[in-house]
UniProtKB/Swiss-Prot annotation:
Protein name from the UniProt record: Thiazole synthase
Organism (species): Shewanella sp. (strain ANA-3)
Location of the protein in the cell: Cytoplasm
Annotated family: Belongs to the ThiG family.
Catalytic activity annotation: [ThiS sulfur-carrier protein]-C-terminal-Gly-aminoethanethioate + 2-iminoacetate + 1-deoxy-D-xylulose 5-phosphate = [ThiS sulfur-carrier protein]-C-terminal Gly-Gly + 2-[(2R,5Z)-2-carboxy-4-methylthiazol-5(2H)-ylidene]ethyl phosphate + 2 H2O + H(+)
Family annotation (InterPro entries): Aldolase_TIM (IPR013785), Thiazole_synthase_ThiG (IPR033983), ThiG (IPR008867)
Any Gene Ontology CC annotation: cytoplasm
Gene: thiG
Keyword Cytoplasm tagged: yes
HAMAP family from the UniProt entry: ThiG
Positions that bind 1-deoxy-D-xylulose 5-phosphate: G156, A182, G183, N204, T205
Domain of life where this protein originates: Bacteria
Length: 252
């Protein structure tokens, strides 16, 4: 069982809500994934007009909402978005995202750390999206973040675990849950992240852009489950030298 800020999750697959062709398809895919924590971009929510109504179907599904600050270019904008989410959605939880560069969407480490410190002081449960930087993740943990979310590769690229060496370091030293976010493009990527010891993964594009999002959501669910079970079972040690599986003496 995964625990974040005192809340238990049976599923270690978190999902997003972007890029689906319809709200109904999004809802069915989330149900198929068995995800219990779903991210929602604050910039997509308009309670006055009801445009792109995500909230009603998600609440009907019984999932916990994780509003994110995607679109924020600095700490000030991210803090404003988080406060807005708390007021509109009634939740302290926030996925902190600050990426001022619209081309590569790389997270701004300096602004993220500053925003995280302020939000934690204000009582938010902060889950920051960051580059796979072990030092930064430790600093975020020290200021009170409930989890860290290092990227596997750039958002939406489906490149997989490009940052694997650094993710291993983060997992090794972290005292809070490590959720691998961004760039996970296939179920095998998700399984591998779990085999490394990640506590959870967040997947959006790979499911939403699939030819069959509902089926792909089920595939990711199974992959995450198998990857976690393999990690808990204990993976064999990787070696460069061959090791005999049967004795070479006693039968000749």
């Amino acid at each position: 069982m995964l625990t974040i800020a005192g809340v238990e999750f049976e599923s270690r697959l978190f999902t997003g809500t972007g890029k689906f062709s319809s709200s109904q398809l999004m809802l069915e895919s989330i149900k198929a994934s068995k995800s219990q924590l779903v991210t929602v971009a604050m910039k997509r929510i308009d309670l006055k007009t009801g445009a792109d109504d995500l909230l009603s179907p998600l609440r009907q599904a019984g999932v916990r909402l994780l509003p994110n600050t995607s679109g924020a270019r600095n700490a000030k904008e991210a803090i404003f978005a988080a406060e807005l989410a708390r007021e509109m959605l009634g939740t302290q939880w926030v996925k902190l995202e600050i990426h001022p560069d619209p081309k590569y969407l790389m997270p701004d480490a300096v602004e993220t750390l500053a925003a995280a410190k302020t939000l934690c002081e204000r009582g938010f449960i902060v889950m920051p999206y960051v580059h796979a930087d072990p030092v930064l993740c430790r600093r975020l943990e020290e200021v009170g973040c409930a989890a860290v979310m290092p990227l596997a590769s750039p958002i939406g690229t489906n490149q997989g675990l490009v940052t694997e060496p650094f993710i291993k370091m983060i997992i090794e030293q972290a005292k809070v849950p490590v959720v691998i976010d961004a760039g996970i493009g296939t179920p095998s990527h998700a399984a591998h992240a779990m085999e490394l010891g990640a506590d959870a993964v967040l997947v959006n594009t790979a499911i939403a852009s699939s030819a069959s999002p509902i089926e792909m959501a089920q595939c990711f669910k199974d992959a995450v489950d198998c990857g976690r079970r393999a990690f808990e079972a204990g993976l064999g040690r990787v070696q460069t030298q061959a090791v005999h599986t049967s004795p070479l003496t006693g039968f000749l």
